[in-house]
Amino acid sequence: MGQFPVQETLMKFLKILEKMVLMDVLSVRNVYEDAERAINKKAAIGADITIENFTDETINAIDMIDDLDDLSKQTKKDLLKVGVDTNEENRSGSFLQVDQSNIFTNNSISDSIEVMNMGVALEKYSWLEDYMWNVVKPDADKYTAKTALREKEEGVTSGYFVRSLPGTKEVMPVQACMFISDTDVMQTAHNIVIAEENSELHLITGCATGDDISSAMHVGVSEMYLKPGSKITFTMVHNWAEEVEVRPRTAIKLADNSTYINNYILTSPVSTIQSFPTAYCDGKNSRAIFQSIQGGKKDSIIDVGSRAILNAEGAKAEVISRAVAQDESQIFARGHLAGNVPNVKGHLECQGLVLSDDSFIYAVPELEASSTNLEMSHEAAVGKISEDEINYLTSRGIPEEEAESMIVRGFLNMDITGLPEELAQQTQNMIDMSLDGI
């Protein structure tokens, strides 16, 4: 008689376990079914790209290296342009993906940070599946769908996993790089970044192509999760070739009292890029800051914006954009703030300089308020360089071309307050390097 309750409890447990396994299977199946339905779905904004024009590189076709010093001299130079130090000085970890191969990971520099490729991370942590395709949906458009279906077909997820452990504050940044070394390749990556409770994480990501690459495509899906009291600074530098198509897909989920700072820099020519990272401020007193520098050159089409959805009391967001259009470039500078509850604040600022009669900037500031007692504001201004400023500098013996360059560089300078002193200096160096030639 005494065994029946035990057997009954065991049967209930087995049924619950069976249901959980079934739900996991259905969840995975739904991801891929959603992706299959969206494989031809155009993105809501931006130029439509025919992804069939690009080839799927075999995963892990390139051998791993033991040290970043094993890279060629030219590749090291290309990486340095996007903030990746092959000597790993003042870094807490490193990750390098070339085409579809993770060729280097260094997880041994800091005790506070975990860095690994997604395939290894998924094997180590069963709970990581819960973070995949959560804030970025597989059916958002054909680019996310393609990334999800490649994961299914190849059975391996490309991209990086970075996690700061609870209560730790690592000052030195992790560096991660997505590098394209072959023409006509479509590179995909699915990255997960987690800042555990009361931790601090700094991440520098550089994306670039080899010196001899003409055409290629990059799709990077990044999902970031900030637990209560945590902070992430995410600095991204892009240096693409002129015929590369770029489609980052990024979303961030913020818990109570967390802070997310995003710095984005693009000053090299590109075919087209369309990116609209979204921060969901779901926690009380959470804060999201987006700052971007966009330098349009040649016939680049740049469609870059930032969005913050303020869903919790005390949440704040700032979106600041600086854009300069040269040659025949086109820049669409977007910003979107949505306040859904009382006592939230948001500010959007978009400024642009048009330096050529054949270029243009289209500023799209959006404010959305669906609650009372909130503060939302925006500033937008697009124009040319002031003649008075040029005359002031030339009157002091500075050549006109150099004077114009100085004004543009000053206009594009980014406020890097909020970063640790050591990281602030490194970030400023990256900005200065990116603005070389502007």
What are the residue ranges of the model-derived segments?
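Long, low-complexity, mixed-charge
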Residues: 1-155
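Conserved beta-strand/loop scaffold segments within soluble protein domains that form the structured core
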Residues: 13, 24-28, 39-42, 123-124, ...
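Small/polar glycine-rich anion-binding or flexible loop at a beta-alpha turn
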Residues: 386, 407-413
